[in-house]
């Protein structure tokens, strides 16, 4: 069973940064790795579900023409909206996934610290929706903490294995260590050097 919305509401009830995104070097380093893994300097339309308080969102915003974020916790949505006030092209919605997947096409979908909260059925549904909304050259980036989390139906390793199996896209970039998994899948298999005419 996927983790229910009240769990996330409680996390944000009296804490604007329940995972210490702003304080922990681990989190700052992970965001830097996430951004470095992206093979394009800029994207047309990015979707970041499970945006929490918008710390990663604020670093994705300068890299795209349109940014859509969402979260299931009302307080997180309010915090992310405040964090993104300086970006007119960014929008934050209150929605629960996979049921309330947005309309539109995206050339980048970022699943950061989200998918292990979903059970296998909901994750499968999310993958189907992601595939349907990715552009012909679209990419999907996944980033997850590897240690088991109490109450989560899946681990990072299970999530990334299922993503790799179900997406049917080439894994064009990855970073794995004992703490975190980062994977980028793309419908465009060309490397950064190939894009820039270096090879």
Model-derived regions, located:
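Class I (Rossmann-like) S-adenosyl-L-methionine-dependent methyltransferase catalytic domain
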Residues: 1-40, 45-49, 53-104, 118-132, ...
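Hydrophobic adenine-recognition pocket in adenosine-nucleotide-binding enzymes
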Residues: 114
């Amino acid at each position: 069973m996927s983790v229910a919305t009240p769990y996330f509401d409680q996390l944000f009830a009296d804490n604007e940064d329940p995972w210490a995104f702003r304080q922990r070097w681990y989190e700052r380093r992970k965001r830097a790795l996430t951004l470095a893994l992206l093979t394009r300097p800029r994207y047309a339309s990015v979707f970041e579900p499970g945006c929490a308080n918008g710390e990663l969102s604020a670093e994705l915003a300068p890299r795209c023409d349109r940014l859509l974020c969402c979260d299931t916790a009302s307080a997180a949505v309010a915090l992310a909206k405040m964090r993104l006030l300086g970006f007119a092209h960014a929008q934050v919605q209150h929605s629960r996934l996979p049921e309330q997947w947005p309309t539109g096409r995206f050339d980048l979908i970022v699943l950061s610290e989200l998918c292990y909260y979903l059970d296998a059925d909901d994750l499968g549904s999310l993958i189907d929706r992601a595939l349907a909304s990715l552009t012909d050259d679209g990419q999907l980036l996944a980033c997850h903490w590897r240690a088991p989390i109490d109450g989560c139906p899946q681990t990072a390793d299970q999530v990334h294995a299922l993503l790799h199996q179900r997406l049917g896209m080439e894994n064009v970039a990855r970073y794995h260590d004992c703490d975190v998994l980062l994977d980028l899948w793309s419908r465009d298999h060309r490397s950064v050097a190939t894009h820039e005419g270096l090879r």
